[in-house]
């Protein structure tokens, strides 16, 4: 899964929309950042999944000191997930270094540490849904619930430059309807420009399968036939 990260330059500000880690690749292929961290004013986070947040501690490690805006549930989830990701980075670096020592190779450092993750969490600001927030003159945002994950959101952004206001929408990952616990996605009725997630956009999704029935069938089938 690709790491999501978009740079928005508007109203004299530079904001990242998400800062994710590319999953399924070697951790050291994730290290280059697409921007100079010290030149970013802030980050807007759509949701807590690592492909949308996994490089935030690396951003902080390399000099980012702005604010990170997310919904309150996303902030709470990131507190767990970013620390967990950092533990993995440290463990993998330790494992690589044991192999490197035996091979006489140069040691490696983790992409980031638990300390970096904790520093990143200090920059988070938990926001409410459906509340407009002025980040700077001419730059207003609002988080909208989209039912993908606890705290997940689309982000509406109003940019006013030279007396003209333009509305942007960053969809984030959008969930399905009629899910237990998670609310249905909120419909956004208008926008001048929409930046849409499309990781699975070329696939046809049929009705949600009966997972409980499938598990029960598997449980009954395996002991008798060892085949599914």
Where are the predicted features?
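Beta-sheet entry/capping signal
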Residues: 5, 14, 66-68, 165-168, ...
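Gly-rich Lys/Arg/Thr-decorated short loops/hinges at beta-loop-alpha junctions or inter-strand turns
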Residues: 191-203
């Amino acid at each position: 899964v690709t790491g999501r990260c978009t740079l928005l330059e508007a109203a004299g500000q530079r904001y990242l929309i998400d800062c994710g880690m590319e999953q399924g690749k070697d951790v050291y292929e994730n290290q280059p950042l697409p921007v100079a961290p010290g030149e970013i004013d802030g980050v807007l986070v759509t949701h807590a999944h690592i492909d949308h947040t996994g490089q935030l501690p690396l951003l902080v490690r390399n000099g980012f000191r702005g604010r990170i805006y997310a919904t309150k549930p996303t902030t709470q989830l990131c507190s767990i997930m970013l620390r967990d990701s950092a533990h993995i980075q440290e463990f993998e670096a330790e494992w690589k270094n044991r192999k490197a020592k035996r091979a006489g190779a140069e040691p490696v450092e983790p992409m980031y540490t638990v300390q970096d993750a904790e520093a990143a969490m200090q920059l988070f600001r938990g926001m409410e849904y459906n509340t407009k927030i002025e980040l700077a003159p001419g730059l207003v945002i609002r988080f909208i619930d989209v039912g993908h994950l606890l705290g997940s959101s689309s982000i509406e952004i109003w940019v006013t430059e030279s007396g003209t206001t333009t509305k942007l929408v960053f969809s984030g990952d959008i969930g399905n309807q009629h899910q237990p616990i998670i609310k249905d996605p909120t419909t956004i009725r208008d926008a001048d420009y929409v930046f849409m997630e499309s990781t699975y956009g070329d696939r046809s999704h049929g009705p949600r399968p009966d997972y409980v029935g499938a598990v029960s069938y598997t449980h009954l089938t395996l002991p008798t036939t060892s085949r599914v």
